[in-house]
């Protein structure tokens, strides 16, 4: 097992767009986790994509009283427009912000029964980032 994770690290402009939507204490909004502590096969597969640009499309903003996130409509490699999928369980998302005492990973529990849901497919342009290996 590899101690780190692959993510789409959002560029500065995209981070700013995400952070402008934050309403809670701890603002995150800088990446989309693809694979956390991946096995060797997944590590090698995603390692070949490091540095590649990705276009990210937002479907909805979902939230509960503790955390809020953008739920994604899709991620595509900019160069080839090949679809990029999250390897880990749960929907691909960008944690926007959360209350103190919670962590970004708690967003996974919120997607099934959010108390707030807003469709953003026609309102938001796409975000951009690059695939990156991040060491814990």
Where are the regions a protein language model picked out?
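Histidine-dependent nucleotide/RNA phosphoesterase domain, centered on the 2H-phosphoesterase fold
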Residues: 1-136
């Amino acid at each position: 097992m590899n101690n780190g994770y692959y993510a789409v690290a959002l560029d500065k402009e995209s981070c700013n767009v995400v952070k402008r939507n934050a309403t809670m204490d701890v603002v995150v909004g800088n990446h989309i986790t693809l694979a956390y502590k991946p096995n060797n096969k997944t590590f090698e597969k995603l390692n070949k994509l490091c540095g590649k640009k990705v276009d990210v499309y937002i479907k909805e903003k979902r939230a509960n009283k503790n955390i809020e996130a953008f739920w994604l409509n899709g991620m595509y490699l900019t160069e080839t427009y090949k679809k990029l999928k999250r390897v880990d369980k749960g929907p691909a998302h960008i944690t926007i912000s959360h209350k103190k005492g919670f962590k970004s990973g708690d967003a996974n529990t919120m997607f099934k029964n959010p108390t707030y849901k807003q469709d953003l497919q026609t309102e938001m342009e796409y975000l951009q980032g690059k695939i990156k290996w991040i060491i814990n």
